[in-house]
Amino acid sequence: MGAGIIGVGRYVPEKVLTNFDLEKMMDTSDEWIRTRTGIEERRIAADDIDTSDMAYFAAKRALQDAGMEAKDIDLILVATVTPDRPFPSVACMLQERLGAVNAAALDISAACAGFMYGMVTAAQFIDTGAYKYILVVGADKLSKITDWTDRNTAVLFGDGAGAVVMGPVSPGRGILSFELGADGTGGKHLYKDEYIVMNGREVFKFAVRQMGESSVRVLEKAGLTKDDVDFLIPHQANIRIVEAARQRLELPEEKISTTIRRYGNTSAASIPISLVEELEAGKIHDDDLIIMVGFGGGLTWGAIALRWGR
């Protein structure tokens, strides 16, 4: 038995903020944003919706998809850099709201790579038999830490949440290999003071290199090649970074997720939101080999090779 995904769910806020809306707020244009980022619109949570709320909505759907009740969950992991407050953790707030009375709970802070860290952590508990069912959530309300006067960052981010229930799956399914990494010397290029601060040029160079290299390495660890890949779900940070990852694996455009056009960069929620979108679109099938890869502040990165199915 391996550790895999047995249920998925996502939540995005109702409010849509388009590039044309941003034109009225700052010195920018739809053409400038689309050309440099690939983003056309993003979702923004209402003032009375916080990270824990979005996490709850996504988690409920993942549990329903898995055909499970909250009391069946042994551990809750929430990847976020925008908790409602420093403590209690979003995971503990989620545990109470779901009624997951048997679950331990903690948050993970690895920025946009957080969901990869969460999935890999969950897999270790499942593989060792310590826990059987684990809820992994990526949720961020980046709008509350975005400087809406800075056109270099304000155009990039959106809000949302994605969740998966992980548990034992059939042999040959689930996570086949993974890589996690960090380079603390790059922390100065992407961080939060009052708002998000980013050295776009340095982050871009790091992301283009690391996304492709990590994807290739997890394939090698699993004894697979680029020809074996059926679908790529990269962190949705910038369409040029996404495209670089696709080219590194030599995949056709129809085999990569590009949800950034509709949602922008949703940080830890990016990969699980994309996973649900592509499943609903019928682009991922049983026994497909999927590569998930992300990077974030820290600097951090993570990649997973996963055989889809239970």
Curated annotation (Swiss-Prot):
Record keywords: Acyltransferase, Cytoplasm, Fatty acid biosynthesis, Fatty acid metabolism, Lipid biosynthesis, Lipid metabolism, Multifunctional enzyme, Transferase
EC number: 2.3.1.180
Gene Ontology molecular-function annotations: 3-oxoacyl-[acyl-carrier-protein] synthase activity; beta-ketoacyl-acyl-carrier-protein synthase III activity
Region forming the signal peptide: none
Pfam families: ACP_syn_III (PF08545), ACP_syn_III_C (PF08541)
Subcellular localization(s) per the UniProt record: Cytoplasm
KW NADP (keyword) present: no
Gene Ontology CC entries for this record: cytoplasm
An example Gene Ontology biological process: fatty acid biosynthetic process
Pathway as given in its UniProt record: Lipid metabolism; fatty acid biosynthesis
Chemical reaction(s) catalysed: malonyl-[ACP] + acetyl-CoA + H(+) = 3-oxobutanoyl-[ACP] + CO2 + CoA
Region (ACP-binding) location: 236-240
Uppermost EC category: transferase
Enzyme active site: C112, H235, N265
SUPFAM superfamilies: Thiolase-like
NCBIfam families to which the protein is assigned, alphabetical: fabH, PRK09352.1
Family per record: Belongs to the thiolase-like superfamily. FabH family.
Physiological role: Catalyzes the condensation reaction of fatty acid synthesis by the addition to an acyl acceptor of two carbons from malonyl-ACP. Catalyzes the first condensation reaction which initiates fatty acid synthesis and may therefore play a role in governing the total rate of fatty acid production. Possesses both acetoacetyl-ACP synthase and acetyl transacylase activities. Its substrate specificity determines the biosynthesis of branched-chain and/or straight-chain of fatty acids.
Free-text note on domains in this protein's UniProt record: The last Arg residue of the ACP-binding site is essential for the weak association between ACP/AcpP and FabH.
Assembly notes: Homodimer.
Descriptive protein name: Beta-ketoacyl-[acyl-carrier-protein] synthase III
Species of provenance: Geobacillus kaustophilus (strain HTA426)
Native organism taxonomy: Bacteria, Bacillati, Bacillota, Bacilli, Bacillales
